[in-house]
Amino acid sequence: MIIKILDPSKNATYLWLPVYFYDEPFQFQILSSIIELVFYISCFHLMTISLYVMLKVQIFHRNLYILYIPMFCVWYGLIAGKLITIAYRLKFVDLDYELGEHIAMWTDDQAKMLHVSSLRGLELLIFGGFVQWHYMYTVVYGILGVAAERAIASVLIENYETNTQLYIPIALTIITQFLAISTSLSVLFHKASVFLSHLPWIISCSLGALAYLFIKIVNENFQKQITNPRRKRLFTISQQFQVKENLRALRLGTRLVFVVFFYVAFVSFGMFALAFDLVSSAYCHFVENFLFLNPYPICFTAMLTIPHWRKHFQNACFTWRLVKSAWTKPKTSTTSVEISTTKKLEAETDLYFRQLNESWI
């Protein structure tokens, strides 16, 4: 959605928001919003359970958690931004004009822009758009930050596990958040072109791929040395654990990369199809919600990849317990028979020993 602000001097200012509004009957908008809220609540449950399991069963280094957790937590802000959009869509926020249909991610067509003379009443919508941009770029830069942390851990293998200093994850978190916020503001206020807005994830993916190869080669080499009985280098227990941790993180990261690539490919195709009117505007609902519902494939992939996480996730997940209880055969009758049999044997045993005791008196 592009907002064009015309001041009295006829100078135009543009705002670029990643929000969508549809030209649909109001009843259908209510229905679609209810369906979206149901999926968001389910996704909220899944995300919360995943965070709980990751914090309860900590199988990675503390520094990795300091980088990972904020990336997951900003999803809650993303949903808050979406709820603001729904409030405007259902006209819970009163405006003096109609917002109209806005399904183009970016456009130069003046007819597809929202023309206003003031931002009065649009403050919440702008904030919601910023939150959504911030989430996207937090993930983009956050992945690069995680890759950098694992690369540093591979280089500083001598004492990284035993080092209690937090300056590395804190510095990486500050840098990634600074980049995410500054990039989000630049895109929001249209200080960056369409190409520049895509440049961060292109650079991050390229650097992340190089970091992935570096971490993989270095740690596989360490693993060969550890398993070699004739090795000349001595690896401490903490260093061996760190190598296994890096390889475990790579296995998890590889699966997540395929999931993210599928997501990016689907959304990119959807945006391309919408831009050239290859599909109807209703398809935009699916493209938009693919961003908000990304915890479904990501959390399931993460939770089911790590065996320790899988067990606790299945026990904590409400949906899993419902399915498990539905497919589990009731054992009430068998249990009652076993209990009655046990009590009968106990009574007979007590009677036997009482009779035996009395016979010796």
From Swiss-Prot:
UniProt feature coiled coil, ranges: none
Question: What keyword terms does UniProt attach to this protein?
Answer: Membrane, Transmembrane, Transmembrane helix
Q: Which InterPro entries does its entry note?
A: 7TM_GPCR_serpentine_rcpt_Sre (IPR004151)
Kindly list the GO CC terms recorded for this protein. Answer: membrane
Top-rank lineage group of the source organism: Eukaryota
Q: Does the keyword Transmembrane helix apply?
A: yes
Q: Which protein is depicted?
A: Serpentine receptor class epsilon-32
**Which organism does this sequence originate in?**
Caenorhabditis elegans
